[in-house]
């Protein structure tokens, strides 16, 4: 299982990489724009924040296959082993095929249906990213889409992995993992929720109180 953070916040990645067993960091154009740092600045910073380990993902901006390939080459000039995110449009599928031929790893993104995701994997994408919460918001079932996609990839494109994205709650992420999803990327707020349980803090405080009452100290 691979756990990613979906952010361009270098400070947060530095802090959470000490805690979480991170496989890397994913970004998209909206995330990069919100951080107001250009790719050539923030991508090396994110790489350094992870101690030079883990995989980075960044997305193309062009809308034609040829333009996407050119964008991918630019991204690889910034971080040599970056995984290039390509929206799974008709042009995106063509770009994924071209990038596969060049040996550039890709992730098929903006996936709203299992068939769409399967096509990106068959075209050569190493990862496929269904938008779980956005599918729910449009009246679909994000978890069912992940389940269907996972089964399709197992049967027809076993070299590809589902990398589920677009979460609003930890429960959505856990349901994806229970459906067999091999990798997930969490926004910072959901990642923080996964390690923030008031009952745990209360339990630790009670342990300290009892120990202090018995031994006059809080150390062993």
Swiss-Prot record:
What EC number(s) is this enzyme filed under?
Answer: 4.1.2.-
Q: Which GO terms describe its cellular component?
A: cytoplasm
Q: Where are the transmembrane segments?
A: none
Principal localization reads cytoplasm
Q: Name one Pfam family in it.
A: TAL_FSA
User: What SUPFAM superfamilies does the database record attribute to this sequence?
Assistant: Aldolase
Q: Which residues form the active site?
A: 85 (schiff-base intermediate with substrate)
PROSITE patterns xrefs:
TRANSALDOLASE_1, TRANSALDOLASE_2
Q: Which InterPro entries match?
A: Aldolase_TIM, F6P_aldolase, TAL/FSA, Transaldolase_3B/F6P_aldolase, Transaldolase_AS, TSA/FSA_arc/bac
Q: Which reaction does it catalyse?
A: beta-D-fructose 6-phosphate = dihydroxyacetone + D-glyceraldehyde 3-phosphate
Gene3D superfamilies assigned to the protein according to its UniProt record, in alphabetical order: Aldolase class I (3.20.20.70)
Tell me the Gene Ontology biological-process terms attached to this UniProt entry. Answer: fructose metabolic process
User: Where does it localize?
Assistant: Cytoplasm
Task: Give the family per the record.
Answer: Belongs to the transaldolase family. Type 3A subfamily.
Q: What does this protein do?
A: Catalyzes the reversible formation of fructose 6-phosphate from dihydroxyacetone and D-glyceraldehyde 3-phosphate via an aldolization reaction.
Assembly, per entry: Homodecamer.
**What is the designated name of this protein?**
Fructose-6-phosphate aldolase 1
Q: Which gene encodes it?
A: fsaA
